[in-house]
A protein has these predicted regions:
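Conserved class I S-adenosyl-L-methionine
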Residues: 1-35, 43-47, 66-69, 73, ...
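C-terminal helical/coil "lid" or tail adjacent to the Rossmann-like core of SAM-dependent
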Residues: 3, 179, 184-244
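Core SAM-dependent methyltransferase catalytic element
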Residues: 181, 254-264
Length: 264
């Protein structure tokens, strides 16, 4: 699956805000190594480097397109290391002080196994910090499921539909509490005010083109893509009516998990 960094970065500030909120909950002062799981274009990794200038920042992502942007933005520097790998396969060579993941783990199933595995990477006194979209019940994703399941698209796109792997915040507390010294898990719903899209595309469609729509658009050719987007846009326009000035209110729910490992 190919990602479009430019499309994703159209709403860079809105996508960055949850990462900043997550980072604010980490009291650790001078970690030696910080792993950014699902680092994407490197926006968050650069903020991690600014927060901890003495740390080695290791960005992991399975998108070559995203990593190319990340590498270009930090060329000439020595603080960052970029690794092209799948989160399901990659393992650090040694325990890590901070494992940070912003808007990536919702693409992976079996969170009971996944979270147990990545918390196992955390060094004594270290922290795991995760933020994940929890948007499957929102109108944007309900509309997507309805279009994909329609007679026109279900044979080709239906197999790509996934059940949300993201559980309620309390589930992650229960999952990690036995191994962690402290677990802090919560849910936040952001109300984004999206500006009118410059190309006339509904703002919520423009947003989801950078994320949730990507797997579906990847298997369609140009003409089919436009037909699919038209079907999706028709539903989204009803679900998210524009304000008089063309802006759109877009509620977005996210789950946060911070777990600390005790010092030995």
């Amino acid at each position: 699956m190919s990602w479009d960094p430019a499309q994703y970065l159209k709403y860079a500030s809105e996508r960055l805000r949850p990462a900043l909120d997550l980072l604010a909950r980490l009291p650790i002062e001078a970690p030696q190594t910080v792993v950014d799981l699902g680092c994407g274009t490197g926006n968050v990794a650069k903020i991690l480097a600014a927060r901890w200038p003495g740390a080695r920042i290791v960005g992991i992502d399975n998108s070559a397109e995203m990593l190319a942007v990340a590498k270009a933005s930090t060329s000439g520097g020595t603080q960052h290391e970029w690794i092209h790998a799948d989160l399901a396969d990659w393992v650090p060579k040694e325990p890590v002080a901070v494992v940070f993941s912003n808007a990536a783990l919702h693409w992976h199933d079996d969170h009971a196994t996944l979270f147990t595995r990545i918390f196992g990477w955390v060094a004594p006194g270290g922290m795991l910090a995760v933020q994940m979209p929890d948007q499957y019940a929102a109108p944007s994703h309900v509309a997507l499921a309805a279009v994909v399941s329609s007679e026109r698209w279900r044979d080709q796109l239906g197999p790509l539909l996934r059940r949300s792997p993201v559980a309620p915040a309390a589930s992650y507390f229960r999952l990690l509490a036995a191994e962690a010294a402290v677990v802090d898990a919560w849910t936040t719903e952001y109300l984004h005010v999206l500006p009118p899209a410059e190309d006339g595309v509904h703002p919520v469609v423009a947003w989801t083109k950078g994320t949730a729509l990507t797997p579906f658009l990847a298997v369609l050719d140009g003409e089919a893509q436009q037909a699919f987007l038209a079907d999706y846009s028709a539903r989204v326009t009803i679900a998210y009516p524009a304000l008089p000035d063309g802006r759109v209110l877009f509620a977005f729910r996210r789950v946060f998990v911070v777990a600390s490992r005790a010092m030995r």
